[in-house]
Protein backbone atom coordinates (compact mmCIF):
# COMPACT_ATOMS: atom_id res chain seq x y z
CA UNK A 1 0.00 0.00 0.00
CA UNK A 2 0.91 3.68 -0.21
CA UNK A 3 2.83 5.24 2.68
CA UNK A 4 2.86 8.99 3.25
CA UNK A 5 6.44 10.21 3.63
CA UNK A 6 7.89 13.58 4.56
CA UNK A 7 9.28 15.39 1.47
CA UNK A 8 12.05 16.87 3.63
CA UNK A 9 13.02 13.86 5.76
CA UNK A 10 13.61 10.15 5.23
CA UNK A 11 10.71 9.21 7.51
CA UNK A 12 7.04 8.24 7.31
CA UNK A 13 4.43 10.74 8.44
CA UNK A 14 2.41 10.08 11.60
CA UNK A 15 -1.37 10.37 11.47
CA UNK A 16 -3.01 12.56 14.13
CA UNK A 17 -6.70 11.77 14.10
CA UNK A 18 -7.93 14.68 16.25
CA UNK A 19 -6.57 17.19 13.73
CA UNK A 20 -6.96 14.87 10.71
CA UNK A 21 -3.46 15.58 9.50
CA UNK A 22 -0.20 13.73 8.96
CA UNK A 23 2.91 15.15 10.61
CA UNK A 24 6.65 14.63 10.49
CA UNK A 25 7.99 14.42 14.03
CA UNK A 26 11.43 15.56 12.87
CA UNK A 27 10.87 18.78 10.89
CA UNK A 28 7.21 19.52 11.71
CA UNK A 29 5.91 19.22 8.12
CA UNK A 30 2.14 18.61 8.07
CA UNK A 31 -0.41 17.74 5.41
CA UNK A 32 -4.17 17.19 5.63
CA UNK A 33 -5.10 13.54 5.26
CA UNK A 34 -6.80 12.83 1.94
CA UNK A 35 -9.65 10.35 1.49
CA UNK A 36 -8.20 9.39 -1.90
CA UNK A 37 -4.98 7.42 -2.36
CA UNK A 38 -2.38 9.65 -4.11
CA UNK A 39 -0.97 6.58 -5.85
CA UNK A 40 -3.97 4.72 -7.33
CA UNK A 41 -6.82 7.19 -6.64
CA UNK A 42 -8.76 4.58 -4.65
CA UNK A 43 -11.13 5.84 -1.96
CA UNK A 44 -10.89 2.80 0.34
CA UNK A 45 -8.12 4.16 2.57
CA UNK A 46 -7.32 2.71 5.98
CA UNK A 47 -4.65 3.59 8.52
CA UNK A 48 -2.52 0.91 10.16
CA UNK A 49 -0.40 0.93 13.29
CA UNK A 50 -1.09 1.30 16.98
CA UNK A 51 -0.46 4.77 18.32
CA UNK A 52 -1.96 6.18 21.50
CA UNK A 53 -4.92 7.72 19.64
CA UNK A 54 -5.91 4.38 18.14
CA UNK A 55 -5.48 2.58 21.47
CA UNK A 56 -7.67 5.21 23.12
CA UNK A 57 -10.37 4.79 20.47
CA UNK A 58 -10.26 1.00 20.80
CA UNK A 59 -10.41 1.08 24.62
CA UNK A 60 -13.38 3.49 24.60
CA UNK A 61 -15.22 1.11 22.27
CA UNK A 62 -14.52 -1.86 24.55
CA UNK A 63 -15.28 -0.03 27.80
CA UNK A 64 -17.78 2.75 27.03
CA UNK A 65 -18.71 3.28 30.69
CA UNK A 66 -15.10 3.86 31.81
CA UNK A 67 -13.46 7.29 31.89
CA UNK A 68 -10.27 7.33 29.80
CA UNK A 69 -7.41 9.84 29.60
CA UNK A 70 -4.59 9.96 27.06
CA UNK A 71 -1.20 11.34 28.05
CA UNK A 72 1.23 12.04 25.19
CA UNK A 73 2.88 14.99 23.44
CA UNK A 74 -0.42 16.01 21.82
CA UNK A 75 -2.44 16.17 25.03
CA UNK A 76 0.33 17.73 27.14
CA UNK A 77 1.69 20.33 24.70
CA UNK A 78 -0.41 23.24 25.99
CA UNK A 79 0.75 25.17 29.05
CA UNK A 80 -0.47 23.56 32.26
CA UNK A 81 -2.04 20.54 30.53
CA UNK A 82 0.57 18.07 31.83
CA UNK A 83 0.07 19.14 35.44
CA UNK A 84 -3.72 19.20 35.04
CA UNK A 85 -3.85 15.62 33.77
CA UNK A 86 -1.63 14.40 36.61
CA UNK A 87 -3.82 16.14 39.21
CA UNK A 88 -6.96 14.64 37.67
CA UNK A 89 -5.39 11.17 37.77
CA UNK A 90 -4.39 11.63 41.41
CA UNK A 91 -7.97 12.72 42.14
CA UNK A 92 -9.22 9.40 40.66
CA UNK A 93 -11.13 11.10 37.82
CA UNK A 94 -10.08 8.41 35.32
CA UNK A 95 -10.41 4.64 35.25
CA UNK A 96 -7.95 4.01 32.41
CA UNK A 97 -4.73 5.88 31.57
CA UNK A 98 -3.22 5.58 28.08
CA UNK A 99 0.13 7.10 27.28
CA UNK A 100 3.61 7.00 25.85
CA UNK A 101 6.86 6.52 27.77
CA UNK A 102 6.21 9.70 29.73
CA UNK A 103 3.79 7.89 32.05
CA UNK A 104 6.42 5.28 32.95
CA UNK A 105 8.98 7.57 34.53
CA UNK A 106 8.91 9.44 37.82
CA UNK A 107 5.15 9.38 38.36
CA UNK A 108 3.35 7.71 41.26
CA UNK A 109 -0.27 6.96 40.39
CA UNK A 110 -2.24 5.47 43.31
CA UNK A 111 -4.70 2.59 42.88
CA UNK A 112 -3.24 1.37 39.56
CA UNK A 113 -3.49 -2.42 39.63
CA UNK A 114 -3.08 -3.35 35.95
CA UNK A 115 -0.45 -2.17 33.46
CA UNK A 116 -0.43 -3.16 29.79
CA UNK A 117 2.46 -2.59 27.38
CA UNK A 118 1.65 -2.62 23.66
CA UNK A 119 4.27 -3.78 21.14
CA UNK A 120 7.25 -4.17 23.48
CA UNK A 121 9.34 -5.42 20.54
CA UNK A 122 9.58 -1.94 19.02
CA UNK A 123 12.28 -0.66 21.38
CA UNK A 124 14.11 -4.01 21.33
CA UNK A 125 14.62 -3.80 17.57
CA UNK A 126 16.22 -0.35 17.50
CA UNK A 127 19.68 -0.30 15.84
CA UNK A 128 21.51 0.50 19.08
CA UNK A 129 23.64 -1.78 21.24
CA UNK A 130 21.85 -0.40 24.32
CA UNK A 131 18.36 -1.36 23.07
CA UNK A 132 18.16 -4.37 25.40
CA UNK A 133 19.30 -2.36 28.42
CA UNK A 134 16.93 0.52 27.65
CA UNK A 135 13.99 -1.82 27.09
CA UNK A 136 14.66 -3.63 30.37
CA UNK A 137 14.82 -0.31 32.23
CA UNK A 138 11.66 1.07 30.62
CA UNK A 139 9.56 -2.05 31.15
CA UNK A 140 10.78 -2.39 34.73
CA UNK A 141 9.81 1.22 35.37
CA UNK A 142 6.36 0.92 33.82
CA UNK A 143 5.78 -2.37 35.65
CA UNK A 144 6.40 -0.49 38.87
CA UNK A 145 3.29 1.62 38.22
CA UNK A 146 1.11 -1.39 39.12
CA UNK A 147 0.43 -2.53 42.66
CA UNK A 148 1.51 0.50 44.67
CA UNK A 149 1.22 0.32 48.46
CA UNK A 150 -0.83 -2.65 49.70
CA UNK A 151 -2.53 -3.28 46.36
CA UNK A 152 -1.54 -6.24 44.22
CA UNK A 153 -0.53 -5.45 40.66
CA UNK A 154 -0.50 -7.26 37.33
CA UNK A 155 1.54 -6.46 34.21
CA UNK A 156 0.73 -7.70 30.69
CA UNK A 157 3.36 -7.23 27.97
CA UNK A 158 2.45 -7.72 24.30
CA UNK A 159 5.23 -9.22 22.17
CA UNK A 160 5.73 -11.22 18.98
CA UNK A 161 8.76 -12.90 20.59
CA UNK A 162 7.82 -14.26 24.04
CA UNK A 163 11.09 -16.22 24.21
CA UNK A 164 13.19 -13.04 24.08
CA UNK A 165 15.77 -13.05 26.88
CA UNK A 166 15.32 -9.40 27.83
CA UNK A 167 11.55 -9.72 28.14
CA UNK A 168 11.91 -12.80 30.31
CA UNK A 169 14.40 -11.01 32.55
CA UNK A 170 11.74 -8.31 32.98
CA UNK A 171 9.07 -10.94 33.66
CA UNK A 172 11.17 -12.53 36.41
CA UNK A 173 12.58 -9.23 37.76
CA UNK A 174 16.00 -10.78 37.14
CA UNK A 175 18.34 -7.78 37.31
CA UNK A 176 21.54 -9.81 37.66
CA UNK A 177 20.52 -12.16 34.85
CA UNK A 178 19.95 -9.21 32.52
CA UNK A 179 23.25 -7.60 33.57
CA UNK A 180 25.23 -10.82 33.00
CA UNK A 181 23.62 -11.38 29.60
CA UNK A 182 24.17 -7.79 28.42
CA UNK A 183 27.80 -7.80 29.54
CA UNK A 184 28.40 -11.07 27.69
CA UNK A 185 26.99 -9.69 24.44
CA UNK A 186 28.96 -6.45 24.73
CA UNK A 187 32.20 -8.26 25.52
CA UNK A 188 31.75 -10.52 22.50
CA UNK A 189 30.98 -7.61 20.15
CA UNK A 190 33.40 -5.15 21.77
CA UNK A 191 30.98 -2.50 22.98
CA UNK A 192 31.14 -0.34 26.13
CA UNK A 193 32.18 -0.89 28.86
CA UNK A 194 34.78 -3.04 27.06
CA UNK A 195 35.80 -0.21 24.76
CA UNK A 196 35.29 3.51 24.19
CA UNK A 197 33.16 4.91 21.37
CA UNK A 198 33.32 8.06 19.29
CA UNK A 199 30.38 8.94 17.05
CA UNK A 200 31.09 11.34 14.20
CA UNK A 201 28.02 12.56 12.32
CA UNK A 202 28.66 14.28 8.99
CA UNK A 203 25.78 16.13 7.32
CA UNK A 204 25.15 18.26 4.23
CA UNK A 205 22.37 19.35 1.89
CA UNK A 206 24.49 18.12 -1.03
CA UNK A 207 24.66 14.32 -1.12
CA UNK A 208 27.71 14.14 -3.42
CA UNK A 209 29.74 16.52 -1.25
CA UNK A 210 28.66 14.61 1.85
CA UNK A 211 29.68 11.23 0.43
CA UNK A 212 33.10 12.54 -0.66
CA UNK A 213 33.90 14.27 2.62
CA UNK A 214 32.63 11.44 4.84
CA UNK A 215 34.93 9.01 3.03
CA UNK A 216 37.82 11.46 3.41
CA UNK A 217 37.23 11.53 7.17
CA UNK A 218 37.25 7.73 7.34
CA UNK A 219 40.46 7.48 5.30
CA UNK A 220 42.15 10.07 7.51
CA UNK A 221 41.13 8.24 10.69
CA UNK A 222 42.37 4.88 9.42
CA UNK A 223 45.74 6.46 8.58
CA UNK A 224 46.03 8.29 11.88
CA UNK A 225 44.79 5.85 14.53
CA UNK A 226 46.43 2.74 15.94
CA UNK A 227 45.75 -0.57 14.21
CA UNK A 228 43.87 -1.79 17.29
CA UNK A 229 41.26 0.96 16.86
CA UNK A 230 38.33 0.18 14.56
CA UNK A 231 36.77 2.77 12.26
CA UNK A 232 33.28 1.76 11.08
CA UNK A 233 31.50 3.51 8.24
CA UNK A 234 30.56 5.80 6.77
CA UNK A 235 26.99 4.51 6.99
CA UNK A 236 23.68 6.31 6.66
CA UNK A 237 22.37 7.72 9.94
CA UNK A 238 18.82 7.03 11.06
CA UNK A 239 16.91 8.79 9.69
CA UNK A 240 19.14 9.44 6.69
CA UNK A 241 17.59 12.80 5.79
CA UNK A 242 16.18 15.42 8.19
CA UNK A 243 14.82 18.76 6.96
CA UNK A 244 16.52 18.32 3.55
CA UNK A 245 19.89 17.57 5.16
CA UNK A 246 21.56 14.20 4.42
CA UNK A 247 23.45 12.48 7.24
CA UNK A 248 26.23 9.91 7.48
CA UNK A 249 27.79 8.56 10.64
CA UNK A 250 31.20 7.13 11.49
CA UNK A 251 31.93 5.12 14.64
CA UNK A 252 35.33 4.65 16.25
CA UNK A 253 35.87 1.77 18.68
CA UNK A 254 39.05 1.92 20.74
CA UNK A 255 40.58 0.89 24.06
CA UNK A 256 43.85 2.78 24.33
CA UNK A 257 44.93 5.10 21.52
CA UNK A 258 47.02 8.22 22.10
CA UNK A 259 46.16 9.42 18.60
CA UNK A 260 42.40 9.72 19.20
CA UNK A 261 42.36 13.24 20.61
CA UNK A 262 44.73 14.79 18.01
CA UNK A 263 42.75 13.14 15.18
CA UNK A 264 39.39 14.36 16.51
CA UNK A 265 40.75 17.86 17.11
CA UNK A 266 42.07 17.99 13.54
CA UNK A 267 38.71 16.94 12.05
CA UNK A 268 36.86 19.44 14.24
CA UNK A 269 39.09 22.33 13.13
CA UNK A 270 39.18 21.20 9.50
CA UNK A 271 35.40 21.50 9.10
CA UNK A 272 34.68 24.28 11.60
CA UNK A 273 34.38 26.96 8.90
CA UNK A 274 33.03 24.74 6.11
CA UNK A 275 29.58 25.96 5.05
CA UNK A 276 28.81 22.88 2.96
CA UNK A 277 29.55 20.27 5.62
CA UNK A 278 28.61 20.01 9.28
CA UNK A 279 30.56 17.65 11.56
CA UNK A 280 29.31 16.73 15.04
CA UNK A 281 31.52 14.66 17.34
CA UNK A 282 30.05 12.78 20.31
CA UNK A 283 32.42 11.06 22.75
CA UNK A 284 30.90 7.92 24.30
CA UNK A 285 27.41 8.68 22.91
CA UNK A 286 24.32 7.53 24.76
CA UNK A 287 22.77 6.50 21.44
CA UNK A 288 24.22 5.52 18.08
Where are these regions (language model features)?
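Short secondary-structure junctions
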Residues: 63-66, 221-230, 272-276
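Solvent-exposed, membrane-proximal periplasmic/extracellular interface segments of envelope transport
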Residues: 116, 235-237, 242-254
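Short amphipathic alpha-helices in soluble, non-transmembrane regions
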Residues: 213-219, 260-270
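Residues at beta-strand starts and edge strands
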Residues: 194-198, 244-248, 275-277
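Inter-lobe coupling/hinge segments of SF2-like helicase ATPases
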Residues: 1-201, 206-211, 223, 250, ...
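Short proline/glycine- and acidic-rich turn/helix-capping motifs at secondary-structure junctions
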Residues: 233-243, 279-288
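Generic structural signal for residues in well-ordered beta-strands
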Residues: 68, 155, 229-231, 279-281
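Short, charged interaction patches at domain edges and termini
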Residues: 248-263, 277, 284-286
